């Protein structure tokens, strides 16, 4: 699974249909959030709560890229 690193302090989290600013560490498992990278906004779904990684000395979150989810018709 490819890893991507993005330095983020605040994200927009979708709560009850409204995008709200939250700290990265306040994201909960299953929430949809968006991050602006290189002028483009990407939506993600959190697969885990943020957790501290001693090796990288930072918070990490496993995520699912919502832009790549395909829906079967």
Swiss-Prot record:
Protein name: SPbeta prophage-derived uncharacterized protein YoqX
UniProt source species: Bacillus subtilis (strain 168)
Gene from which this protein is expressed: yoqX
